[in-house]
């Protein structure tokens, strides 16, 4: 079935975001059950949930990959992007937030707003995603709806609108009161799967609380919406339609967040949640036109726009790549404008290459339905793309556009991985290639000295999951090293006239090459990734023939790969070749390469070499009472506090801390703050290691 522009008002692209145990997967499962996609309820406890379809996730009970699932509620199509709730996977959360129009934030009725939910909420703020809240697990001992609403206001700085009240609490939780229509919905014990619920008048015991709740709601909506404010000032009661329309406007503009409640596990409250998704969250038509730039316009000075219409030229964003055992590589696309048909040729505007669209599928968690055409505003998976990776744009060849590219942070933690057998070596190659396609925050390098494969990622859990996927999906048996920090070396002073002569005489042609070099430090740009290497040739009068100069350069570069202190790459160096000598018969490229390499090593060891380490920008969000502890701990990790600020009722500490001091930080921070603080960490720059620490690292590297 192809959606047409007329249907766009009836499409919702939503994500379900939550803290790790708030019941996100269960809530998604129930949505799929009530919309008729699933006929047996999948429980995360049993490891059978439809959305968590990678074996990894079923074992851990956490959701890692955002599978996109399509379902229908009444006459509305809902595309659900399942987002991971763990901090190491924030890259996936960010990626899915880009392609959503709205989100449902699920909270645990007992725990309320947990640290991870704060982090995901801030990311959603960054992308201006309108959302509604579902306070789940209302049947749990200690569940408190009002406390959750207060926490959403205080901790997240949001403006919550309680549109429901719970009937009963904990094990007596029976249903909800609709504060807009002033009715009660009660789930009868006779329908254990919750398909049936009765709409009744509000029970007397709740009449007063419901009336107060309704008045509070109208008052809060009036503050966020001029139309209701006028009625309110005139003393008129808004109709249900007026109230719903005003809440929708306030939700889409970000002025307010409707809050609902229920228990997904006990099958209560999910149908009203579906009604709220349709009523309050935006359709693709409510979202502003997406912006991008012309691929030729390198400075991105001119902004191009694409409106969500089939009349506009095609623009689609690849937001997820997955491998399917039967179909091969699946690329998930969000179509922002135009139409996509199977067999069509489109342009990948980032790489400037053409791609042919194979089959197009609408995905239902782990089942799929083939379609031939898809229009603006929809989310689908396509087969047959050769060159497209995550974050790239596919567009009409005649109207190229690059939708803002997603920036991926550089990985900060690495482990060596060693295949056990020859056949594991081959499997490892395939696994690494596939995983790197799916996840741009995962990088692979080879350590030239040890020949080991080194994989790097965003955190300890991130790497653990990747390694487990290699074992499970690709059957790679491998030994895994300990996580390591990527150090660098540089020099601090200039040395001049360092001479080295390489000569070897063993009957017949020998080897001969003499070089004289200067070595001086270059300013290192902070990312430490810059090779920071320059080579200047000052040879005159043919003292070294021109054809041997590149060999001297190559020798110096090779030597720079393994520094003189602890064998880490040397950066920020300028080599000047000043003088030399050659022999008509015995000189060769190899002789000059060796001479260059040896002269470089000698010069570097005289040039006051120092060790550099990656320093991370760490941002800790903590309740005020733990502030002193958090700062003291960061100082003990050689951290430099940069700033402290208040944000939505919590304190934010920003500091620069060496990565080597951050291992195991997540556990320490949790225990210091009872799990209430959270942190983010991104690479900041390379900085010199203090000499006492440097001596330890060097001794360790030399095996002393």
Curated annotation (Swiss-Prot):
Record's keyword terms, sorted:
Cytoplasm, Elongation factor, GTP-binding, Nucleotide-binding, Protein biosynthesis
Where is each tr-type G domain found? 9-285
- Which CDD domains does this one have? EF-G, EFG_III, EFG_mtEFG1_IV, EFG_mtEFG_C, EFG_mtEFG_II
GTP-binding listed as a keyword: yes
Stored Pfam families: EF-G_D2, EFG_C, EFG_III, EFG_IV, GTP_EFTU
Listed InterPro entries: EF-G-like_DII (IPR053905), EFG_II (IPR041095), EFG_III (IPR009022), EFG_III/V (IPR035647), EFG_IV (IPR047872), EFG_V (IPR035649), EFG_V-like (IPR000640), G_TR_CS (IPR031157)
Q: Which domain of life is it from?
A: Bacteria
The record lists GTP as bound by 18-25, 82-86, 136-139
SMART domains membership: EFG_C, EFG_IV
- Report a single Gene Ontology molecular function: translation elongation factor activity
Q: Any one Gene Ontology biological process term?
A: ribosome disassembly
Which cellular compartments is it found in? Answer: Cytoplasm
The keyword Electron transport belongs to this UniProt entry's keyword annotation: no
Q: What is its main location?
A: cytoplasm
Similarity comment: Belongs to the TRAFAC class translation factor GTPase superfamily. Classic translation factor GTPase family. EF-G/EF-2 subfamily.
Relate the protein's function as given in its record.
Catalyzes the GTP-dependent ribosomal translocation step during translation elongation. During this step, the ribosome changes from the pre-translocational (PRE) to the post-translocational (POST) state as the newly formed A-site-bound peptidyl-tRNA and P-site-bound deacylated tRNA move to the P and E sites, respectively. Catalyzes the coordinated movement of the two tRNA molecules, the mRNA and conformational changes in the ribosome.
The molecule here is called: Elongation factor G
